[in-house]
Design a protein with these regions (language model features):
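Extracytoplasmic/secretory soluble proteins
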Residues: 1-402
């Protein structure tokens, strides 16, 4: 796929991912060396790159490349403007074209496996107490999986910047959305540090209580991200609090390959509160623009126009379809109504990590669309195509939604 895209755009990008370093460590090393890749997404460390003068300003290029300009309204583009008056990066993950076709909660939640819900008769779970109650009862009746693997009631990821998995819960349990490191109380227009609230105190008391009962993974405080993902990939972890994007891309395809989805190991999100009857606003991801990071072009790039031209091409519908749907007749089909779909074999291939590595090329950190294709019919990405979302679900997940 990369070769097909290269022939059509004239550009081939070699992507390099962090291994064994935080974004701050990697960015610090790059800045110290003074040589930068053509493109960079520094995560939470974009500001040091900006301060080092390592980034190219976008101001003279946005209007030249209509696909890029179309990503945001004029007011939204202003959100990316830095204190020197220029724009240096853009977030590529939140852009919706046309009708919203969201099928997945892509934000943070308390997650629970559908096998637990099915066993319990799909109970109403409103509070943190309800959540741990059903996990405790399931564990008492089902201490192991079918193959003898010990179930892990609840684990927590705390490594480095991902400590949000343990820290953020207080704001959700108080009924607020994810506004970063604080609660924004719009009733009185005040900012509250959720770490100091009574709800957060009760949350940590509950974790202590569950830890004493043996319901929390004893390795939670020292496990690495890779160890955490390895545990989830076994299907043994009944629940956790995390961002969907932080675990799903790594474990969902593994479940399909190993048949764990057929055993009810997929996770569904729950919008819990600390007490019953409280309002909750946990599902608000698409409404919030994150302008703090994104893709940037560095001063080491020898052909800045070519870099912007490639990003612009990434948003052409033909290239976008190649990135996310693949090649018609090989990776997907088109029915008599012009709707894209996959055969069962194509779905298996799309979930196979080996096939993904050898054949697909999503350029996942480059500009992209969610929402509706410019043909007005299809979803920009397969996960949001209603037929693919439904056909891609294992029976235990289908039963849960019913």
């Amino acid at each position: 796929m990369q070769e097909i895209i290269a022939k059509k755009t004239g550009v081939r990008v070699k992507e390099t991912w962090l291994t064994g370093q935080t974004d701050a460590e990697a960015v610090g090393t790059i800045i110290a060396g003074g040589e930068y890749p053509d493109f960079i997404n520094g995560g939470d460390s974009m500001k040091p790159l900006y301060d080092a003068g390592a980034l190219v300003a976008w101001d003279d290029y946005i209007d030249k490349y209509p696909n890029i300009k179309e990503m945001y309204s004029d007011a939204e583009w202003e959100s990316f403007r830095q204190d020197d008056g220029h724009i240096y990066w853009a977030n590529v993950f939140q852009n919706k074209y046309g009708e919203d076709k969201t099928t997945t909660h892509n934000d943070e939640a308390f997650w629970i496996q559908v096998r637990v819900l099915e066993w319990a008769g799909y109970p109403e779970i409103e509070t943190l107490d309800d959540y741990f109650d059903v996990i405790e009862r399931y564990m008492e009746a089902n201490p192991t999986m079918d193959d003898g693997t010990a179930n892990i009631p609840y684990t927590i990821l705390c490594e480095d910047w991902r400590y949000f998995c343990i820290e953020n819960a207080g704001q959700f349990l108080d009924g607020y959305p994810n506004d970063g490191s604080v609660i924004v109380d719009t009733d009185n227009m005040k900012i509250v540090d959720y770490n100091t609230t009574e709800t957060t105190k009760r949350y940590f008391e509950k974790l202590n209580e569950e830890y004493a009962k043996g319901m929390i993974d004893p390795e939670f405080a020292t496990q690495t991200y890779d160890e955490y993902i390895a545990k989830l990939s076994t299907g043994a972890v009944l629940g956790m609090c995390d961002q969907w994007w932080d675990f799903a891309y790594n474990v969902n395809d593994v479940y399909k390959q190993q048949g764990l989805d057929l055993k009810g190991c997929n996770y569904v999100p729950l919008g819990l509160t600390i007490d019953k009857g409280m309002d909750q606003m946990w599902h608000t991801y698409g409404d919030t623009l994150n302008a703090s990071n994104g893709i940037a072009i560095t001063t080491s790039c020898k052909d800045v126009d070519a870099a912007f031209r490639f990003m612009n091409s990434c948003l052409d519908q033909e290239i976008h379809d190649l990135r996310f749907w693949g090649v018609e007749g090989i990776d997907y089909e088109v029915d008599e109504n012009g709707l894209y779909y996959r055969t069962e074999e194509q779905r298996v291939n799309a979930a196979d990590t080996g096939y993904q590595a050898s054949h697909l090329c999503t350029y996942s950190y480059f500009p992209q669309w969610l929402g509706t294709s410019k043909d007005g019919k299809n979803a920009m990405q397969p996960a949001e195509q209603p037929s693919e979302f439904q056909n891609g679900m294992a029976e235990p997940l289908v039963k849960c939604f019913k």
